[in-house]
């Protein structure tokens, strides 16, 4: 028996979804990421292109910011800021048609991710001007992870006291032994 040498197979990257293909046609650079467990298309974007890409997606029907948040990939790794956009008006219009097929009922949604270095002060442009609902969501992400949102109208802590040191949801955060709260009255 002779064995033929097998050529190593390189795992194929994710297939571009409809939103990625649309962004390519519009000339927007982005990174294809694996879809999430529900099949939602996930796209990586550079922070300098975030506002332009979000504005283009909003013009294409993604009229609802369902969620904005952040997470820490681990000590020494990157911070991630994500935006989940939904084409809500299209979904409402489809509901009125009465077509209950799974393809007609499918909601157009996309998740954008911006990967940031934890060195210095991570920052990216605020999308508050495009989605007013980003107000408290961006403030919470700032409060918990220390990501600054340039152009945000209220750039201050939301949950933690103003004089709190550090960013509590970063994985390298060291909780202080003692913090004295002032009386509220």
Swiss-Prot record:
Lineage top rank: taxon = Bacteria
Instruction: Name the GO terms of the biological process aspect.
Output: photosynthesis, light reaction
Catalytic activities: a plastoquinone + NADH + (n+1) H(+)(in) = a plastoquinol + NAD(+) + n H(+)(out); a plastoquinone + NADPH + (n+1) H(+)(in) = a plastoquinol + NADP(+) + n H(+)(out)
Q: Which keywords does UniProt give here?
A: Membrane, NAD, NADP, Plastoquinone, Quinone, Thylakoid, Translocase, Transport
Do you know which Gene3D superfamilies this protein is assigned to?
Answer: NADH:ubiquinone oxidoreductase, 30kDa subunit
For this UniProt entry, the molecular function terms from Gene Ontology, in alphabetical order, are: NADH dehydrogenase (ubiquinone) activity; quinone binding
Chief place where the protein resides: membrane
UniProt membrane topology term: Peripheral membrane protein
Where is the protein found, in the record's own terms?
Cellular thylakoid membrane
* E.C. number(s) listed in UniProt: 7.1.1.-
Q: Name one GO cellular component term.
A: plasma membrane-derived thylakoid membrane
Q: How does it assemble?
A: NDH-1 can be composed of about 15 different subunits; different subcomplexes with different compositions have been identified which probably have different functions.
Q: Which NCBIfam families match?
A: PRK12494.1
| UniProt function note | NDH-1 shuttles electrons from an unknown electron donor, via FMN and iron-sulfur (Fe-S) centers, to quinones in the respiratory and/or the photosynthetic chain. The immediate electron acceptor for the enzyme in this species is believed to be plastoquinone. Couples the redox reaction to proton translocation, and thus conserves the redox energy in a proton gradient. Cyanobacterial NDH-1 also plays a role in inorganic carbon-concentration.
For this protein, the record's PANTHER family field holds: NADH DEHYDROGENASE [UBIQUINONE] IRON-SULFUR PROTEIN 3, MITOCHONDRIAL (PTHR10884:SF14), NADH DEHYDROGENASE UBIQUINONE IRON-SULFUR PROTEIN 3 (PTHR10884)
The family annotation for this protein states: Belongs to the complex I 30 kDa subunit family.
The cross-references to HAMAP family, in alphabetical order and at most eight, read: NDH1_NuoC
> What is the name of this protein?
NAD(P)H-quinone oxidoreductase subunit J
């Amino acid at each position: 028996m002779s064995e033929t040498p097998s050529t190593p197979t390189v795992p194929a990257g994710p297939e571009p979804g409809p939103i990625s293909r649309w962004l390519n046609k519009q000339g927007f650079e982005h990174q294809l990421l694996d879809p999430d467990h529900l099949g939602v298309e996930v796209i990586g974007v550079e922070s300098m292109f975030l506002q332009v890409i979000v504005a283009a997606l909003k013009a294409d029907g993604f009229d609802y910011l369902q969620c904005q948040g952040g997470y820490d990939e681990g000590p020494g790794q990157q911070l991630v800021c994500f935006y989940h956009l939904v084409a809500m008006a299209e979904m409402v219009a489809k509901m009125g048609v009465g077509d209950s097929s799974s393809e007609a009922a499918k909601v157009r949604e996309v998740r954008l991710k911006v990967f940031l270095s934890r060195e210095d002060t991570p920052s990216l442009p605020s999308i508050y001007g495009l989605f007013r609902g980003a107000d408290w969501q961006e403030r919470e992400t700032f409060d918990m992870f220390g990501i600054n949102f340039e152009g945000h109208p209220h750039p201050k802590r939301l949950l933690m006291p103003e004089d709190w040191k550090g960013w509590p949801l970063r994985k390298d955060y060291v909780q202080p032994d003692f913090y004295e709260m002032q009386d509220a009255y």
